[in-house]
Amino acid sequence: MATLFIADLHLQTEEPAIVAGFLRFLAVEARQADALYILGDLFEAWIGDDDPNPLHREIAAAIKAVVNVGVPCFFIHGNRDFLIGKRFARESGMILLPQEKVLDLYGRNVLIMHGDTLCTDDAGYQAFRAKVHNPWVQRLFLTLPLFIRRRIAARMRAGSKAANSSKSLDIMDVNAQTVVAEMEKHRVQWLVHGHTHRPAVHELSVNDQPAFRVVLGAWHHEGSMVKVTPDNVELIAFPL
């Protein structure tokens, strides 16, 4: 009896080892779970459900196979794949969740999210996020030809990489006050998120009680998952 959480796989054809590791994870660990939650940035980039990239179909089929054996799979959008829509959700069998969700896991109330909304010290990123999450901007982007969308996405990734190279690590991490405010708002003592690529279990105080923030790692040379059971919450790194 366990519920699994992963995030920040950044799947792309240029990283076949990570793709293969994820497919193995779906074939083994995921099938033994009560449920699988993917907390964003499953893909390195997403320019629309109509992108014919074969990798997308392969991943959709692999997730659907997990769903078909009775393991529900849920998805929260990340900052790289926020345009994943209903078509891909149908193909993969995933259930799309809002950007924040509270789960009752074996008696624990756990808040889950991608995590980028916690990085409120990075004003430039938050302004950019507000623009690209505007429904009108998204609709306009999705009407463009695929080759133009690819160019725009590549330019945005390059710009993001350049901008991040000049930012301090502290600015790109979560804001402690924002974390506490979110946990107090949702009345939880547990938070699980990704985005920062800094796997750790942080202890803090929320509502004058002990609380925990569990940060998933990105999938690079190893995989990262959070495993929640009736008795424990574990942050686990494993070879790909």
UniProtKB/Swiss-Prot annotation:
GO cellular component, one term: extrinsic component of plasma membrane
The protein's required cofactors: Mn(2+)
Protein residues bound to Mn(2+) 1: 8, 10, 41, 197
Cofactor note: Binds 2 Mn(2+) ions per subunit in a binuclear metal center.
EC number(s) per entry: 3.6.1.54
Molecular-function annotations in GO: manganese ion binding; UDP-2,3-diacylglucosamine hydrolase activity
Cellular compartment(s): Cell inner membrane
Source organism superkingdom: Bacteria
Bilayer topology: Peripheral membrane protein
InterPro entries with a match to the protein in the record: Calcineurin-like_PHP_ApaH (IPR004843), LpxH-like (IPR043461), Metallo-depent_PP-like (IPR029052), UDP-diacylglucosamine_Hdrlase (IPR010138)
Residues the entry annotates as binding Mn(2+) 2: 41, 79, 114, 195
Keywords: Cell inner membrane, Cell membrane, Hydrolase, Lipid A biosynthesis, Lipid biosynthesis, Lipid metabolism, Manganese, Membrane, Metal-binding
List of residues binding substrate: 79-80, 122, 160, 164, 167, 195
GO biological process: lipid A biosynthetic process
Pathway info: Glycolipid biosynthesis; lipid IV(A) biosynthesis; lipid IV(A) from (3R)-3-hydroxytetradecanoyl-[acyl-carrier-protein] and UDP-N-acetyl-alpha-D-glucosamine: step 4/6
Catalytically driven reaction(s): UDP-2-N,3-O-bis[(3R)-3-hydroxytetradecanoyl]-alpha-D-glucosamine + H2O = 2-N,3-O-bis[(3R)-3-hydroxytetradecanoyl]-alpha-D-glucosaminyl 1-phosphate + UMP + 2 H(+)
Family as reported in the entry's similarity comment: Belongs to the LpxH family.
Function summary: Hydrolyzes the pyrophosphate bond of UDP-2,3-diacylglucosamine to yield 2,3-diacylglucosamine 1-phosphate (lipid X) and UMP by catalyzing the attack of water at the alpha-P atom. Involved in the biosynthesis of lipid A, a phosphorylated glycolipid that anchors the lipopolysaccharide to the outer membrane of the cell.
PANTHER family xref list: UDP-2,3-DIACYLGLUCOSAMINE HYDROLASE, UDP-2,3-DIACYLGLUCOSAMINE HYDROLASE-RELATED
Protein name (record): UDP-2,3-diacylglucosamine hydrolase
